[in-house]
């Protein structure tokens, strides 16, 4: 009886062992592909999509030129918030003068005088930058600067030479730091002083 029970137990255990050893009808390992870890996948896509940081020399040169032009134009606004015109008659004269500055020979002559004086400022980086511009661009920039100075010198109530000279004193600290603006301001003075003398 004991032998029978023992042999039955051994047979049962052998069956279980055979079931564990025998292959199961599951998907084979060869057809299984493990998913790529998320971190690795992100790094791979980023490395393929990120553009190169190195820009061609021509792009860098163009951006530097744009910065220089922007710096020059920004200087025009430094004196733009000093006041507004109150005298209507004087304002009309100023607008006529500025129109001539852009459209008539007066502006061409004034720009040429400024250019000649800028040539003497060899040590000035800003002067050399202006002189390297194309003639048309240079003329427009000088005319804009002349207009700003005319409006600055004749702003508000300015109906006599004392007031006119007072405007000059107010911007002296700025002019001492910028030789180019001094040259342009002096030409603007010559262009606009007759508006005061005529009154």
UniProtKB/Swiss-Prot annotation:
Transmembrane segment boundaries: none
Q: Where is the composition biased (Low complexity)?
A: 58-67
Q: Which UniProt keywords apply?
A: Host-virus interaction, Inhibition of host innate immune response by virus, Inhibition of host interferon signaling pathway by virus, Inhibition of host STAT1 by virus, Inhibition of host STAT2 by virus, Interferon antiviral system evasion, Viral immunoevasion
Q: Does the keyword Transcription regulation apply?
A: no
Q: State the source organism's domain of life.
A: Viruses
Q: Where is this region: Disordered?
A: 19-67
GO terms (BP aspect): symbiont-mediated suppression of host innate immune response; symbiont-mediated suppression of host JAK-STAT cascade via inhibition of STAT1 activity; symbiont-mediated suppression of host JAK-STAT cascade via inhibition of STAT2 activity; symbiont-mediated suppression of host type I interferon-mediated signaling pathway
Q: Specify residue ranges for compositional bias: Polar residues.
A: 19-34, 43-57
Q: Does the keyword Transmembrane apply?
A: no
Q: Which family does it belong to?
A: Belongs to the respirovirus protein C family.
Q: What is the recorded name of this protein?
A: Protein C
* Organism in which the protein naturally occurs: Human parainfluenza 3 virus (strain Wash/47885/57)
What is the phylogenetic placement of the source species in the record?
A: Viruses, Riboviria, Orthornavirae, Negarnaviricota, Haploviricotina
**Encoding gene per record:** P/V/C
């Amino acid at each position: 009886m004991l032998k029978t029970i023992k042999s039955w137990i051994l047979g049962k255990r052998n069956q279980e062992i055979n079931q564990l050893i025998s292959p199961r009808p599951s998907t084979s390992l060869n057809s299984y592909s493990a998913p790529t870890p998320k971190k690795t996948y992100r790094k791979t896509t980023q490395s393929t999509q990120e553009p190169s940081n190195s820009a061609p020399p021509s792009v860098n040169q163009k951006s530097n030129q744009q910065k220089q032009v922007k710096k020059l134009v920004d200087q025009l606004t430094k004196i733009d918030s000093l006041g507004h015109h109150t005298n209507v008659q004087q304002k009309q004269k100023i607008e006529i003068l500025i129109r001539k500055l852009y459209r008539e020979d007066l502006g061409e002559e004034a720009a040429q005088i400024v250019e000649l004086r800028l040539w003497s400022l060899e040590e000035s980086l800003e002067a050399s930058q202006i002189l390297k511009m194309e003639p048309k661009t240079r003329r427009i920039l000088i005319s804009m600067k002349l207009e700003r100075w005319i409006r600055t010198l004749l702003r508000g109530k300015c109906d006599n030479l004392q007031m006119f000279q007072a405007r000059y004193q107010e911007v002296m600290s700025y002019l001492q730091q910028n030789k180019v603006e001094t040259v342009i301001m002096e030409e603007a003075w010559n262009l606009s002083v007759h508006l005061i003398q005529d009154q």
